Amino acid sequence: MTEEAGKFPFTRGVYPNMYKDKLWTMRQYAGFTSAEESNRRFHYLLEQGVSGLSVAFDLPTQIGYDSDHSMSEGEVGKVGVPISTIHDMDLLFKDIPVEKISTSMTINSTAATLLALYIISAEKKGISSKTLNGTIQNDILKEYIARGTYIYPPNASMRLVTDIFDFCSTHAPKWNTISISGYHIREAGSTA
């Protein structure tokens, strides 16, 4: 069997001409101390020519704590942007044409919540979830094996992962529903 780019089983790529016609998405991982600061950075990056955004979330957001929770003290905005509410998500993407760019969210345990906030924020602007393009990491096994930022038991967590697959297949078909990150597992001692 001769495999061709742009044709099933896509082992030679998903597009017939691959990057000859369309360059890969250029993006920089970013998330600052607040949604407003991060929004300013995103606007700057877009002005510099990036074709996508990559959101870094703070630790409380990664493990499901609101910024005002006592367990969040000292961690809010330290390693990324704090997102606790739809208002925060609205501020993060204020005046950004999310229907024209690709957004990557490096988030796992709270992936379903953050994706829902992103979609709701877009829909409030009149943008259909079916037009949104992006990726959510949604790699919960990495959290158990390497990072430790999981919330729920494994079965419940895996159910959330697959619920995202199911939801996006109908409501956000251009969305990449998982991005496996082997780096963390390798750094935690994997030999494969």
Q: Where does each model-flagged region fall?
A:
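Catalytic alpha/beta active-site cores
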Residues: M1-A192
